């Protein structure tokens, strides 16, 4: 299964594509779609959609995962993000891809074992688990990778989910994972 995680934003949108194979997870591609900052919101949204079209056509995901919308105190920012999310969803739906959404806490929990982890902790854990090497990725990119990882780890579209449905491959919990994989810990 190949999942595209998207962290939408009007100035830059992070994306991460992860494939789940019998050998584990492998990053197929990740990066930022950056519209021209001087352009209007409508022009930036159009550029964002074109960039996501390219990512989808090149990396061929089978599903898309997004973080659920967070609404803070700034109404204007929430409205802009709503427009961006709508455009992202329309772009994805044009490619007939299923979409799943996850709460930020659920994403952090699936990556780090705690729902209160900061973005830097999520990035560090993903760097180890997905073998991203020493290269630091922008937080928008690691957020997108975390969203895709969460989808696969939760079994929404994964081999692991199929095993759980068959009653095999039950999780032994976070502590057992840490004990079995000390090389992934700092």
From Swiss-Prot:
Residues reported to bind Mg(2+) 1: 7, 140
Compartments in which it is found: Cytoplasm
Active site: 7, 67, 140
Cross-referenced InterPro entries: RNaseH-like_sf, RNaseH_sf, X-over_junc_endoDNase_Mg_BS, X-over_junc_endoDNase_RuvC
Catalytic activity: Endonucleolytic cleavage at a junction such as a reciprocal single-stranded crossover between two homologous DNA duplexes (Holliday junction)
Co-factor requirement: Mg(2+)
Cysteine pairs bridged by disulfides in the record: none
Subunit structure: Homodimer which binds Holliday junction (HJ) DNA. The HJ becomes 2-fold symmetrical on binding to RuvC with unstacked arms; it has a different conformation from HJ DNA in complex with RuvA. In the full resolvosome a probable DNA-RuvA(4)-RuvB(12)-RuvC(2) complex forms which resolves the HJ.
Protein name in the entry: Crossover junction endodeoxyribonuclease RuvC
């Amino acid at each position: 299964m190949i999942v595209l995680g998207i962290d939408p934003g009007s100035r830059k949108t992070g994306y991460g594509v992860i494939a789940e194979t019998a050998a584990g997870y492998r990053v197929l591609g990740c990066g930022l779609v950056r519209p021209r900052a001087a352009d209007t919101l409508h022009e930036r949204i159009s550029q964002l959609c074109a960039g996501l079209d390219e990512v989808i056509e090149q990396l061929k995901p089978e599903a898309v995962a997004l973080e659920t919308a967070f609404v803070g105190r700034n109404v204007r920012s929430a409205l802009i993000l709503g427009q961006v999310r709508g455009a992202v969803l329309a772009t994805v739906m044009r490619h007939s891809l299923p979409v799943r959404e996850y709460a930020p806490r659920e994403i952090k929990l699936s990556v780090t074992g705690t729902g209160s982890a900061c973005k830097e902790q999520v990035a560090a854990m993903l760097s180890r688990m997905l073998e991203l090497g020493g290269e630091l990725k922008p937080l928008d990119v690691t957020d997108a990778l975390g969203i895709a990882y969460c989808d696969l780890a939760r079994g929404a579209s994964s081999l692991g989910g199929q095993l759980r449905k068959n009653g095999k491959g039950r999780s032994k919990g976070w502590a057992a994972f840490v004990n079995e994989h000390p090389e992934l810990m700092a």
